[in-house]
Amino acid sequence: MSTYEELISLLRDCKRVLRAARKPTWDEYIESAKIAGLGILIVGGVGFLIRVIVQLIELYT
């Protein structure tokens, strides 16, 4: 398959996906924001705990 044919195939696939997609509702946006925010808080909390543990280890060694 040539590069041109691969590009045409990719564009067809993208077009098909975009046709099937729909704009999310406001409630779906809010739900996604809550989930993303929770994920950010969890990752930040884990990072904070690791930093505190490392500082405590350095303090007592």
Swiss-Prot record:
GO terms for biological process: intracellular protein transmembrane transport; protein secretion; protein targeting. HAMAP family: SecE (MF_00422). One of its GO terms (cellular component) is plasma membrane. Component of the Sec protein translocase complex. Heterotrimer consisting of SecY (alpha), SecG (beta) and SecE (gamma) subunits. The heterotrimers can form oligomers, although 1 heterotrimer is thought to be able to translocate proteins. Interacts with the ribosome. May interact with SecDF, and other proteins may be involved. This is Protein translocase subunit SecE. Belongs to the SecE/SEC61-gamma family. The chain crosses the membrane at residues 37-57. It is a single-pass membrane protein. It is found in: Cell membrane. One of its GO terms (molecular function) is protein transmembrane transporter activity. Coiled coil: none annotated. Essential subunit of the Sec protein translocation channel SecYEG. Clamps together the 2 halves of SecY. May contact the channel plug during translocation. NCBIfam families: secE_euk_arch (TIGR00327). Keywords: Cell membrane, Membrane, Protein transport, Translocation, Transmembrane, Transmembrane helix, Transport. It holds the Pfam family SecE.
